[in-house]
Amino acid sequence: MTAFKPIKEGKVREIYDNGNSLIMVATDRISAFDVILKNKVTKKGTVLTQMSKFWFDYTRDLLPNHMLSVDVQDMPEFFRQPQFTGNSMMCRKLTMLPIECIVRGYITGSGWASYQKTGKVCGIQLPEGLQESQKLPEPIYTPSTKAEIGDHDENISYEQSIDVLEKQFPGHGLEYATKLRDYTIALYKKCAEYALSRGIIIADTKFEFGLDEDGNVVLGDEMLTPDSSRFWPLEGYEPGHSQPSFDKQFVRDWLKANPDSNYDLPQDVIDKTIAKYLEAYELLTGKKL
């Protein structure tokens, strides 16, 4: 059996080169505030992979994505070990575009903090009198640059995203920037409408895109997971304050309340976190993991 070593390790994912494809493994690591925490959250990697699979299948008619298979029987023997089952995805190789494509349908988090100070979110002027967690009249696209591990992503305007892409892909900056914006909003609208019918509000999320060998824009990375999105329960939703959530917000809140924790979570916080992830998966897909 040929052993594989990751060619790239992110905060949560490991990527392996499989010749003409990649194998992306979502680990049980958890990060918050750009730091990898000391604890592992059992089953988290499986939730991320299976949820991405669900959304990739759901949106394939809108645009192509990089997923080839989540069945380890389709992968080299090395990946048929227990630690890779359920949390591994074989993907097409893409040239990734250097923009995090963030879309916000509701005003919350850093967007809410910015709006209170300036009336704007990432330079976009919003109507007066919005409340925290309120639905925006239309989803807004607020791209950022991709930072290396340890650095913070930097919010940029749509116009700046044209320049960033033009530098790397001369002659294509405007074309790619426009496609990223339009795909991001179209994907969000389609999926947010579906999620609402299943009792979940998708407040915001981020997508990443790449180019295939023919220069087509293809959806990559992960899709609409509790790691990349804010999911709120529809039941009990009311603007005017922060909302309970199915995502990492629980972990962030605990860390903020316990600044001396040294990024070491107690077991009950870990248990509640995975329970939230599993609940979101079951509500959205109608399946149990």
Region roles according to the model:
Residues 103, 202-223:
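Conserved metal-phosphate-binding beta-hairpin within the catalytic cores
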Residues 117-118, 126-175, 219, 223-284:
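Anionic ligand-binding catalytic core segments
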Residues 21, 96-98, 198-202, 214-217:
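Coil-to-beta-strand transition motifs
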Residues 1-148, 261-289:
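Active-site loop/lid in soluble adenylation, ligation, and acyl-transfer enzymes
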Residues 46, 50, 175, 179-186, ...:
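Generic recognition of stable, solvent-exposed alpha-helical segments in well-folded globular domains
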Residues 169-203:
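A long amphipathic alpha-helix within ATP-dependent nucleotide-binding catalytic cores
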Residues 33, 112-113, 214, 228-230:
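Intrinsically disordered, low-complexity acidic/polar segments
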